[in-house]
Every structure is written in structure tokens, then in C-alpha cells.
């Protein structure tokens, strides 16, 4: 089957629902495991690469995709319209958009990044503004899933402490520098969550199913 490349971040956007063999598979598996409702906000939509993994796992949430880069959504629309389900795109700054929301979300995915000196890092807003704002915009059983990146000026412990707003689980990888932080009252304890995250990833067919490590925060 053909696959198409999302040029902005050089991550593959599948032409059909299925695994990405990237950190998106873990994030999609966390939605499948922990989501308790139909409303999902995706801050940093880019080319929508995570959507294929979500739909392959049977996640049918209504997705609000937010990004200042609209060309990625155009690419996504051109190859995913037949299978992507309900996806609405907002070309807007993530902080401004989230502040305007009056209805709470069941899931917020924070996947923002910026280029800095040839590296891809977290923007200031992901560290200083969004953590508390996202916590205010989820339901009582809602979850926040953050894709963390090595960022100059922040050790991992400091970065994690600044974006963490409640109980959660941190996922680490053997082949990626990223770390995924899953927060919320429905996340559960690490042994239980790890077992079912890996199960979801095996069902998805993700190559990362055997290389994740989890710890409780």
C-alpha cells in the first residue's frame, strides 16, 4: 500500500488506518485505553499522522485539530477523507484556541513543536502556559497526553515537573528521544496501564510495542 510523506516533520502519514511505528502509536493507544468520552482536542495537528492509528484502534472521537500550519491539514484531507471520521481543523494558535473553548474535552493531545538551531523542541507555551490551561479544559475523567521532546535549558526532570499537573505515567522509548506523559484520574497504576498499552500496540501492529518502558509520576 502506498504511503505519503508529510514534509514538515518528515513523519509518514499513512494513506489508510494503521500503525505509524512512532510515538503516535503510544499516544493513540493511550486514547483507546483511557478516553471516557467523544471529544478530543489535538494541539499541533500538523499532517494528522496520529489519526490513522486512532481510527485503526476503533477510537471514534470527534477530533478538533489545531495548528497554525494549514498546509498539513490540506495534505491530510487529500488522502484521509474516506476513513478519517469526524475531524475539524482550526488554523489558530493553540493557547488562544483553547482559552476560547467553553465545553470541556475528554482528551487533549499536546503535540506542539518548533524548530530551533536545527533541532525540534517544545515551544515555550507547552511549558509555561498550556499545562494549567489544559487541566482546566478537561472533564473530571479527562486525560492529557503530551509528546515531550529534549529542549535546551531543561533537564528531563525539570521539563516533566513543569508540564505535569496531576497523577500520571511517563512512557520512555528505546529508539526515540521523545517521552510521552499521560495524565488523568482514569490512567490507573503503571503495571495495569503498561500491560494494556502494549496490548493495544500489538493489536495495532506497532513495531514499538516491545520497546516502551513506563513509570509512575
Where do the PLM segments sit?
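Short, small-residue-biased leader/transition segments that mark boundaries at the very start
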Residues: 2-7, 140
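The AdoMet/dcAdoMet-binding core of the Class I SAM-like
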Residues: 16-141, 152-160, 164, 170, ...
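Class I S-adenosyl-L-methionine
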Residues: 8, 150-217
Amino acid at each position: 500500500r502506498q504511503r505519503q510523506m508529510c514534509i514538515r516533520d518528515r513523519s509518514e502519514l499513512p494513506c489508510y488506518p494503521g500503525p505509524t511505528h512512532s510515538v503516535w502509536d503510544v499516544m493513540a493507544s493511550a486514547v483507546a485505553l483511557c478516553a471516557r468520552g467523544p471529544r478530543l482536542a489535538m494541539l499541533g495537528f500538523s499532517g494528522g499522522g496520529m489519526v490513522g492509528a486512532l481510527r485503526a484502534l476503533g477510537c471514534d472521537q470527534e477530533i478538533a485539530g489545531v495548528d497554525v500550519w494549514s498546509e498539513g491539514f490540506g495534505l491530510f484531507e487529500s488522502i484521509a477523507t474516506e476513513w478519517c471520521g469526524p475531524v475539524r481543523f482550526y488554523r489558530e494558535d493553540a493557547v488562544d484556541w483553547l482559552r476560547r473553548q467553553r465545553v470541556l474535552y475528554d482528551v487533549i493531545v499536546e503535540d506542539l513543536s518548533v524548530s530551533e538551531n536545527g533541532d525540534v523542541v517544545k515551544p515555550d507555551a507547552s511549558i509555561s502556559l498550556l499545562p494549567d490551561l489544559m487541566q482546566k479544559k478537561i472533564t473530571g475523567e479527562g486525560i492529557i497526553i503530551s509528546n515531550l521532546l529534549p529542549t535546551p535549558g531543561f533537564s528531563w526532570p525539570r521539563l516533566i515537573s513543569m508540564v505535569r499537573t496531576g497523577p500520571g505515567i511517563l512512557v520512555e522509548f528505546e529508539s526515540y528521544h521523545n517521552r510521552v506523559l499521560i495524565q488523568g484520574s482514569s490512567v490507573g497504576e503503571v503495571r495495569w496501564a503498561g500491560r494494556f498499552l502494549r496490548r493495544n500496540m500489538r493489536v495495532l501492529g506497532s513495531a514499538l510495542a516491545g520497546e516502551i518502558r513506563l513509570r509512575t509520576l
